Amino acid sequence: MLEIKNLSKKYSGKTVLDNICYTFESGKIYGIMGENGAGKSTLFRCIMHLEKFDGDISVSHPHKIGYLSDTPFFYSFVTGMEYIEFCLKASNISIDKQKITALNEKFALPLERYATNYSMGMKKRLMIMTLMLQDYDLVVLDEPFNGLDLAGVILLKQWIKQMKEEGKCIILSSHIISSLTDICDEISYIHNGKTVANFTGKSANEIEMEISKFYLEFTEI
């Protein structure tokens, strides 16, 4: 599905990603953890080819990748409905307003209002809802739980699990360890641009203990 080989990225001479290697398979959910500035968002932006990088990234179906940025952006004077319609048209998907309305019964968004006037949580819900209306083989979600209320988190987790059942590949980042252990098959910890630990079948407490050891080692150097 997605293979990353020797991925490196520098900004103004500073190394942000250092020889990263991953293999992400279909039908699995992958979590990426790391402190602020560890390189998580840069990794995702490289996967989406929004950044230049050294190394190789190969994707089975490069035109069927969905992406949720950690910083929602909307043009001025575009309503929630217009944003959805624009994204669907860009993906050559027919607009089914009945389907949109039915899905919005769960999200409860004022689609007639300008999206720039939405709260951060509402903007995040609008972007997630738009992704749900499209058919992707690979979905990359950068801090998707940030700004969501409990209902939004539940809806998002249900959708992620559904995509896994459909054989999709999902990669997401979060600072909330339990949010990842609840749904992820594998979790990686990035520190200073390097993957320093991988976890499978570990509880949130076990991962926190392991990460604490790494953090103490790094701060003592």
Language-model-detected regions and their locations in the chain:
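Q-loop/switch helix immediately C-terminal to the Walker
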Residues: 71, 77-91
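H-loop/switch region of ABC-family ATPase nucleotide-binding domains
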Residues: 173-175
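The feature captures the beta-strand-to-loop junction immediately N-terminal to the Walker
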Residues: 33-35
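Conserved structural motif at the start of ABC-family nucleotide-binding domains
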Residues: 2, 17-19
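Catalytic Walker B motif of ABC-type/P-loop ATPase nucleotide-binding domains
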Residues: 139-143
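Helix N-cap at the start of a conserved alpha-helix in ABC-type nucleotide-binding domains
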Residues: 150-151
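Conserved ABC nucleotide-binding domain
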Residues: 103-119
